[in-house]
Every structure is written in C-alpha cells, then in structure tokens.
Amino acid sequence: MSKIEKKQASASNLLLGAGLNLFETSSLGQPLEVTKVQMAANRTQTMAQAIKAIMSRGGILGFYQGLIPWAWIEASTKGAVLLFTSAELEYWGRRLGLGATSAGAIAGMGGGVAQAYATMGFCTCMKTAEVTRAKQAATGQEVKGTFRVFADLYKEKGIRGINRGVNAVALRQMTNWGSRLALSRFLEKPIRYFTGRTEAEPLTTGQRFVASVSAGALSCWNQPLEVARVEMQSLTKGIQHSSPGIMQTIMSIYKNNGIKGLYRGAVPRMGLGAYQTFVMVFLADCVRGYLAK
C-alpha cells in the first residue's frame, strides 16, 4: 500500500488557479453560464431562442453580463477554498481507511459546501440577478446599476437578501464536486487497467482529462438543483418578498414545466464543465511546464 500524502496547495498553485479561473470565466465560461441561466430561468425557450434573447441585450456583450465584478470575485476565490478544504478532507478520509472513491466524494462534498457559503452564494445571486433583471428594460421598468441592485437586496433582507438560494448553491456544489471527484477516482481504475498502469504510477494529462471530463458530464444529474437555484435568485419578477425553499421551488417547477423543466440548461452546463476541465487540466499543466523551465 502506497504512503498517503496530503496534496499541498502552495501560494504559486493558488495564484495559478485563480489566474486560470479568471481566464476561463472571461473567455468562454461566462457565455456558457449566461446561456445556462437564461434557459433555466425561461424554461419554455429552446437554446436558439435563449441565445437570441441574450443577443438582444447588447449583442456579444450580453453573454458577459455579471462578469464584472461578481464572476471575477467568484473565480478568484472559489478555487482556493476548494483546494484547501478538499485536500484536508481527502487526506483525513484516506487516513481513516476510506477508499479513493469514498474519500474523493467526501472531499468534493465538503469543498463544494465551503465554496458556496464562503464566496459563491452572493456571487451566483448577483450573476443571476444581472442576467434576469436585464429583461426589465423591455417592460419599461427602471434599469438599475449592479451595485444599486446589490444595495436594494441587502436593504430588503440583509445578508439573506444577497445570499438568496445559497442553500441550493451549497447542495449543487456538494453533489457536483462530490460526484465529480468520486467519479474521477472511480474512472481512473478502468483507465489504469486498460493501460497497465499501477496505483503508484501517475496518469498522463490526457488520461486525467478523459476521467475528469467524463465525471463532469455525468455530474450534471443534479441539474434540478441548479434550475431551482436560478429560480430562487431570478429577478424576472423583481425583488421577491417571499423566499420559498428548495423543495417547494422544485415542486413548483415540476408542476408548471414537468421533468424537462428541471433539466433546462443541462447542455450548456455540460459544455461549461468540459471547458473548465480543459482550462484547469491542460492549460494548467502547460503553464506549470513552461514555468518549470
């Protein structure tokens, strides 16, 4: 049995992760995020209709609503939270005798929850507000600045106002990263079997990419939580004074839109997961290799 070692999160790795996260969000990440939110908030729209609606809100710039400052704040902080939390939990899980899959699941779940409550709650709330509130211009309502919306939400309900849907975010992140890390570890086993690699031998970048992308796609089974999160944070109808719970929101969506409504936006979300993996696996390794020269 190989020695169990804790994955170290050095300052350089954290800075690299933050930089790559910012690049991912500022390039293709935010357009996929906006498309996903648009489809989840408007569940009768096809993808083509969703893209047309986004384009009507400023052309290409419509795909970057919520990027500054909310997506940048989220991108620059969530990686560090996940790395620290998941590394500790996976290490102690293995120390307590858990297998790689189980320890990976616990590490991912804990890291996802930490992300949600530390930084992602108010960031996702404001990003969703930016995408959904833009439609107010078509109905003749006043279009406020992003910080004015933030102030109004805070004035209405304080910290809870700017963290609407945070429990749904936590559940989504918990199940998403729990599934992704557990499935990644699980999928590494057949890859090692077919390539003849032992447990002590590290997988190649391509092999890890295949395992990560496959795990990311399979992790979209929790899309109902994402649709519920968008519904809870949406400002399509203005600032809501009531705050329905997660299950109440899911049941309402199911009643009005059926099972398909709970999986709206799954395709762009799968694309987002694949792109994030490409950036954080391939580009990260390329940058590390370049800096090591």
UniProtKB/Swiss-Prot annotation:
Solcar repeats lie at residues 9-91, 102-190, 203-290. It is a multi-pass membrane protein. It comes from the Eukaryota. It is found in: Mitochondrion inner membrane. Its main location: mitochondrion. Pfam families: Mito_carr. GO terms for cellular component: mitochondrial inner membrane; mitochondrion. One of its GO terms (biological process) is mitochondrial citrate transmembrane transport. The chain crosses the membrane at residues 15-35, 53-73, 96-114, 169-189, 208-228, 262-283. Keywords: Membrane, Mitochondrion, Mitochondrion inner membrane, Repeat, Transmembrane, Transmembrane helix, Transport. GO terms for molecular function: tricarboxylate secondary active transmembrane transporter activity. PANTHER family: CITRATE/OXOGLUTARATE CARRIER PROTEIN, CITRATE_OXOGLUTARATE CARRIER PROTEIN. Belongs to the mitochondrial carrier (TC 2.A.29) family. This is Uncharacterized mitochondrial carrier C83.13.
